[in-house]
Amino acid sequence: MLSPKRTRFRKQHRGRMKGVSYRGNRICFGRYALQALEPAWITSRQIEAGRRAISRYARRGGKIWVRIFPDKPVTLRPAETRMGSGKGSPEYWVSVVKPDRILYEMGGVSETVARAAMEIAARKMPIRTKFVIAE
C-alpha cells in the first residue's frame, strides 16, 4: 500500500473538497486514462486494488502510471470510546481527489484492452469515472 515515508505533522484537518482539479487533469504519460467525475477521498487500498486490477487484465503488455498518491492521514478513535481525550490515532491514508483528476494512465496496449482494464479499475473506485484518450 502507498503511504508517505515521513510527514511534517502526524495529523491533519479534514478540509473541504471545493471546485474541480486544475492540476493533474491532463494525460501526461500514457495514451489512455481514467478520470474522476466526483470529489472523494480515495484510500491507499482502493488505489492499490485498482492498480492490481489493471495490471492483471493487461498482463505483461503496456505500462501503468498511478497519478494519485495518498498523502492525507485519516484518524479514527478506538471503538466504544467516550468523546474527548484528544484526536484519534492515524489509521490509514487517503488521496483527496476532485472532479477531472486523472487517476490512472496506460500506454502500450490497444484501446479495447485499455478500456476493459480501466472499466475493472473503475469498479474498485468509490466514485463515478470516465475513460479518456489523449488527443
From Swiss-Prot:
What keywords appear on the UniProt entry?
A: Chloroplast, Plastid, Ribonucleoprotein, Ribosomal protein
What InterPro entries does the database record attribute to this sequence? Answer: Ribosomal_uL16, Ribosomal_uL16_bact-type, Ribosomal_uL16_CS, Ribosomal_uL16_dom, Ribosomal_uL16_sf
This protein's assembly is summarised as:
Part of the 50S ribosomal subunit.
Database matches in NCBIfam families = rplP_bact (TIGR01164)
State any GO CC term. Answer: mitochondrial large ribosomal subunit
GO terms, molecular function: rRNA binding; structural constituent of ribosome
Family designation: Belongs to the universal ribosomal protein uL16 family.
Q: What is this protein called?
A: Large ribosomal subunit protein uL16c
Location in or out of the cell: Plastid, Chloroplast
Please provide the Gene Ontology terms (biological process) for this protein: mitochondrial translation
Q: Major place of localization?
A: plastid
